From Swiss-Prot:
Role of this protein: Catalyzes the synthesis of alpha-ribazole-5'-phosphate from nicotinate mononucleotide (NAMN) and 5,6-dimethylbenzimidazole (DMB).
GO biological process, one term: cobalamin biosynthetic process
Database matches in HAMAP family: CobT (MF_00230)
Keyword Isomerase annotated: no
Catalytic activity: 5,6-dimethylbenzimidazole + nicotinate beta-D-ribonucleotide = alpha-ribazole 5'-phosphate + nicotinate + H(+)
EC numbers for this chain: 2.4.2.21
UniProt keyword 4Fe-4S present: no
Domain of life of the source: Bacteria
Protein name: Nicotinate-nucleotide--dimethylbenzimidazole phosphoribosyltransferase
Pathway participation: Nucleoside biosynthesis; alpha-ribazole biosynthesis; alpha-ribazole from 5,6-dimethylbenzimidazole: step 1/2
Entry's family note: Belongs to the CobT family.
Keywords associated with the record: Cobalamin biosynthesis, Glycosyltransferase, Transferase
A molecular-function term among this protein's GO annotations: nicotinate-nucleotide-dimethylbenzimidazole phosphoribosyltransferase activity
Organism expressing this protein natively: Phocaeicola vulgatus (strain ATCC 8482 / DSM 1447 / JCM 5826 / CCUG 4940 / NBRC 14291 / NCTC 11154)
Length: 345
């Protein structure tokens, strides 16, 4: 079993960071969220001069047994087909990774297909998709622990490559369903408010999806612990992302959080280790029903609101230039004393 030892960032540098930020050549607070990010990143890295190095987008992919209950508009083969598209550079996440200088890492967490691992997909498969959680647990506790361990190892790999800032993405037809159930059970928000259109369900489809998820929750026979809820309803790619996030926090890396799926992954991660949220920057508020509610429940502020609902890490990557600006502010702006400017506030 993988044990994580995550600490909150040391607060000893807080006053020095605030002093540096307040003495840059600008009115106090005038760079808003950039100043908040600079403080957070400075505390994570324990420095007055933070850096961003070798950004990676780790994309975990897996299939979901709940799809057999008709909860998704898209057939499950889209999972492997899109993974092939990622491999060949033709997806939304690909152009954004190219544009913003991210290295894309593709991981098979449990896709129900024979994938071409020799072409660059990392084989971390735990199985050929989860079971339908309408009928019982999606995965065993042993499988959940294996996912956490393998996700952590992927983070170790990119950290060894010099990465100190990582976004996590996902591909898994049906994965808004486990996300909605996690959100409901881990926050107490009504299930109806947590269920949305996913990849494009109409109102009738959303109602059917809700009914399936409601039956699944009603039939839940676990112990109610966070780990049990994660395993009973989760997806392999989602739990692997949790492992990746927890290890990233343990290594004091910056975690860029993407959309509805990944927000619920870090919600789940925070139920295991609350400290992980100190390392998280929330990239955007997506268009999926429930995303704003779960962000509000976690009391976090996303950087962007662009109506995105693609996943893959795309929203987190779109927000990255704002993170870069916050670091550049700390390293490139002059202070009042050095610039011989009277402090005017």
């Amino acid at each position: 079993m993988k044990n994580f030892h995550i600490e909150y960032p040391d607060e000893g540098l807080r006053e020095a960071l605030i002093d540096k930020i307040n003495n840059l050549t600008k009115p106090k607070g005038s760079l808003g969220v950039l100043e908040d990010l600079a403080l957070q990143i400075g505390l994570i890295q324990q420095t007055l001069s933070p850096t961003l190095s070798h950004p990676h987008n780790v994309l975990f992919a897996a299939d979901h047994g709940i799809v057999e209950e008709g909860v998704s508009k898209s057939p499950k083969e889209i999972t492997w087909q899109q993974l092939s598209n990622f491999l060949h550079g033709g997806a939304g996440v690909n152009f954004l990774c190219r544009q913003h200088g991210f290295k894309l890492v593709l991981v098979d967490s449990g896709v129900d297909y024979d994938l071409p691992y020799e072409k660059g997909i990392i084989n971390c498969s735990v199985g050929r998709g989860t079971h339908s959680f309408l009928k019982g647990p999606a995965m065993s506790m042993e499988e959940m622990e294996l996912c956490l361990e393998r996700g952590a190892k992927i983070t170790d790999m990119i950290h060894a490559d010099g990465c100190n800032v990582v976004s996590f993405g996902e591909m898994g037809i049906g994965n808004t369903s486990p996300s909605s159930v996690w959100m409901h059970l881990l926050t107490g928000i009504s299930l109806e408010q947590c269920v949305g259109a996913g990849s494009g369900l109409d109102s009738e489809g959303i109602r059917h999806k809700y009914n399936v998820l409601k039956q699944s929750v009603d039939h839940y026979a676990g112990d109610g612990s966070a780990k049990d809820i994660i395993a009973w309803f989760g997806g392999y790619e989602m739990v692997m992302a949790i492992g990746g996030m927890l290890r990233a926090a343990e290594l004091r890396m910056i975690i860029l959080v993407d959309g509805f799926i990944m927000t619920n992954c870090i919600l789940a991660a925070s139920k295991l280790h609350p400290e992980v949220l100190s390392y998280a920057i929330f990239g955007h508020q997506g268009d999926e029903t429930g995303h704003k509610l779960v962000l509000d429940a976690m009391k976090v502020r996303p950087l962007l609101n662009l109506g995105l609902r693609l996943g893959e890490g795309t929203g987190a990557i779109c927000a990255y230039p704002i993170v870069v600006s916050s670091v550049n502010m700390m390293n490139e702006m002059d202070n009042f004393a050095h610039a011989s400017i009277t402090k005017y506030f």
